C-alpha cells in the first residue's frame, strides 16, 4: 500500500520471499536481476487476513512500513502496544524465569514504552528495537508463558504523581540499585538491595534489577510487590483505551 495515496501498489503471494531495494529514489522489487519500481518512496506491508509479516527471517504482528531515508530503506513495525510487549518481554527476560517476575517485566516495559513514546520521532518512529530503548524481537520470540504475562497485566502501568513513569530496569545492579538516573534524581528511585548477589553488575543499575525480580518471585513476591520494592511510592493504573 502506498503510504501517500493509501492505494494498493501490488499484491504479493504469501510465504514467498521478495527483495525490496532502493531504486532511483523509489522502492523497487528485485527479481531475476531486474528492478520493478513500485512508484513510491514509502509503502506498508500487511497481511490480507489475520497473520504476520516477515522481514530478515523474523515474523512480526501488525504491519511493516518500508520507507526511503538517505538512500536506504528503513523498516518500521506498526502495531498495538500489547502486541509490541509480546515481543519485548521474552527479549528482555528469559521466558523460563518466574511467572510473577515476567508479569513485573511486562508492567515495567509497558510503562517505559508509554513514557517514551515519540523518543525517536526524528527518525519517523517511536522506539528502537534494541536496548537503547527496549529489546524487541517480534512474534518470532513469543512464548505462551510470556504472552500470558502480558495478557494478565493488560493496560497496567506504573505512575507517580499521576504520571506514567519511565520504569527503568537492567539485568543486574551488583548488590544495590542506583538512584542516579542519568544526571537527575527521581523521587521513586531509591537505592535498595537488588537481591542479585553473586551476579556481576550488568547494565545501568537504575530501577528494577531483573535478576533481583526473579529472585524475589522465587521468595513468594508477586509482580505488584516486586515493582513496589524497586520503585518507591508508585501507584498502579489501568489504561482505559489501550492501543
Language model region names:
Residues 1-243:
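Conserved, single-site charged/polar hotspot
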Amino acid at each position: 500500500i502506498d503510504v501517500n495515496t493509501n492505494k494498493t501498489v501490488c499484491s504479493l503471494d504469501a510465504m514467498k520471499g521478495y527483495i525490496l531495494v532502493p531504486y532511483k529514489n523509489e522502492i523497487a522489487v528485485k527479481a531475476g536481476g531486474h528492478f520493478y519500481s513500485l512508484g513510491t518512496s514509502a509503502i506498508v506491508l500487511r497481511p490480507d487476513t489475520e497473520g504476520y509479516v516477515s522481514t530478515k527471517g523474523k515474523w512480526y504482528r501488525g504491519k511493516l512500513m518500508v520507507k526511503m531515508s538517505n538512500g536506504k530503506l528503513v523498516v518500521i513495525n506498526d502495531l498495538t502496544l500489547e502486541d509490541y510487549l509480546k515481543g519485548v518481554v521474552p527479549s528482555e527476560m528469559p521466558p523460563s524465569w518466574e511467572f510473577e517476575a515476567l508479569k513485573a517485566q511486562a508492567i515495567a516495559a509497558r510503562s517505559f514504552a508509554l513514557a517514551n513514546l515519540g523518543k525517536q520521532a526524528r527518525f519517523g518512529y517511536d522506539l528502537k528495537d534494541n536496548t537503547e530503548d527496549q529489546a524487541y524481537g517480534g512474534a518470532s520470540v513469543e512464548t505462551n508463558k510470556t504472552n500470558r504475562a502480558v495478557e494478565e497485566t493488560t493496560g497496567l502501568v506504573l505512575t507517580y504523581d499521576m504520571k506514567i513513569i519511565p520504569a527503568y530496569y537492567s539485568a543486574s545492579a551488583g548488590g544495590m540499585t542506583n538512584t542516579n538516573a542519568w544526571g537527575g534524581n527521581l523521587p521513586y528511585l531509591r537505592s535498595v538491595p537488588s537481591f542479585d548477589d553473586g551476579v556481576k553488575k550488568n547494565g545501568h543499575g537504575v530501577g528494577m534489577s531483573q535478576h533481583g525480580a526473579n529472585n524475589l518471585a522465587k521468595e513468594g513476591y508477586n509482580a505488584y510487590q516486586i515493582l513496589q520494592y524497586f520503585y518507591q511510592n508508585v501507584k498502579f493504573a489501568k489504561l482505559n483505551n489501550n492501543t
